Amino acid sequence: NACAPMGEENAERVCAAAGKALGCRPEDVVVAATGVIGQTLNVAVIEQGMPELCGAAAHTAEGSDAAAHAIMTTDTVKKELAVETVIGGKTVRMGGIAKGSGMIHPNMGTMLCFLTTDCAISPEMIKSALLETVQVSFNRISVDGDTSTNDTCCVLANGLAGNPVITEKGPDYDAFVEALRALCVELAKKMASDGEGATHLITCTVTGARSEQSAETIAKSVIGSALTKAAIFGADANWGRVLCAMGYSGEDFDPDKVDVAFQSQAGSVQVCAKGRGLDFDEELAKKVLTEHDVTIAIAMGEGDGACTCWGCDLTYEYVKINGDYRT
């Protein structure tokens, strides 16, 4: 809340309006918001439109598609996905819609994600599953390094799949988490790919680190580096930007053991071995970096820790979008 007491009051008014229109308790309504920080919400407009909004809701694929479109702001593409798995001999379905293009650097940017499932699972277990999943999906993306005040990711389960209720960790819980993780990772990648003004999805893989946490810190530092992002935009294989971002990540590592390569559908180019630059084919490197999906592969040579994070390039369009975002 960035609007003092009025922010909380407005949220309660939205809950009351939604509860009345849907025939449920206001406390069963979750409010998610995006927009200019500190600018008060025009609740009267929402209250006026709530009956029509709720009346138009449809429990169909078309309804989900409409909702995915409705939450878009500076997004250029809608982000929705569905998966199926088998739990306890029953087919379980999960679906998700999300929005997020700028101010994406989640720490649970402005990102919103709404997940639904028909799995029968206890509140305690679904909370545990969501926490596990968010850590390895949405918390591993970055568009611009700015963490929003309003990050939201929620999951709703109605239990209609008919599987034995998941009340403890075990094979059924693991299957649920695996499906939820697959869903959220793909939604997270869609967000990174659709970063404001972005022309590239950047995947950074770190292997051979001292721990998974160390690998994550290094990978997030690289995808968050403005200079690395700008280099990818320009298809410039400037691997020094990568090592620089690794260095200021705060993690302790031996730079003389680091290997770096750029990869895409066009091929792979190793640019650094044991911390030293290599002679490489600049023309091939440019082809590799011209592809939409680009991977920065980093091998640390120090342990078994590994992590993958996702980001995007930094373009002129990003500056244009955010230079006059409020006006």
Predicted features and spans:
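A structural signal for small-residue-enriched, beta-sheet-centric alpha/beta enzyme cores
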Residues: 1-327
